[in-house]
């Protein structure tokens, strides 16, 4: 499929699911949201970071078209794929980078950026490997886009890679969009490119291979029986990766009230044990410790105040409770952005503690609510 900048812009006119990014003479078109209606035409499936020259309107860098997980889309339903033979390439858990020659220099881009730390790392790896840099330039000068996956311990998502590398995952013709890696595999290896591991098999065989595997994302399955508008590509992910990626995404994005709720429901250990990314685990563990320390301080204050409950006037108890809250606020001043915990909750917890009732559960629920409504808020 031949694409020009004019055709791409016309395709997404007035469509909030897509955005246009510009840098000097470069124009990048990519989707904002991955929703079912986003990719309702073949042309829209090409708009995943495709990059054009604003001067000529021609494609200068063409990453993958949008393809789907097994069972995610009518074209990837298992019944439809049954018995088909696929080239199975190892699916890597990194960052896709695609290059272009800009003002005589080979530059890398991600799907939605012209510059970010992953791009800097990828360009550094290219500079350190002269053979790879020259091979990349040769393909670009032929009107082809080598598509790389950057793997690096520095940018770990789920799988803990020990080395940092640029792996060539495909090569596309900028004009036609044809995929060329499989037919040019031997030549590409001789040029100095490293390719993902490969085997041939059915979807059923691929699923069996990764059924019990750990630290494996899965396969990109490719079938070239049809080529227009695209060959059939399918993402097949391991059960382990689905679980680990869910846990990673959940923990990475979890707000403080839900993080604290994991603790209240004794689920924190299960989630943390599944996440393989040490940076995310450390950050969220540190945050959860602050939340639980605040909670334990509230419990201690309630127990202390319970000794006064029934012996002093309500106003006096409330004043003492206010002092306890101020003390907690001072104790955690480096961590707290806001601490408006209602004094009534603390006096009620003191009453429950005095009566040997579940004041701990009561305070946990109230702190969860305060975090949810952001009357108690940690610094970022």
Swiss-Prot record:
Protein's UniProt keywords contain Transcription regulation: no
EC number of this enzyme: 6.5.1.-
Gene Ontology terms for molecular function: ligase activity
UniProt keyword annotation of GTP-binding present: no
Taxonomy, superkingdom: Bacteria
Record keywords, A-Z: Ligase
InterPro entries: T4-Rnl1-like_N
Function of the molecule: Putative RNA ligase. Is able to catalyze the adenylation reaction of ssDNA 3'-terminal phosphate (ssDNA 3'p) to 3'-adenylated DNA (ssDNA 3'pp5'A).
Entry protein name: Putative RNA ligase
Species for this entry: Thermovibrio ammonificans (strain DSM 15698 / JCM 12110 / HB-1)
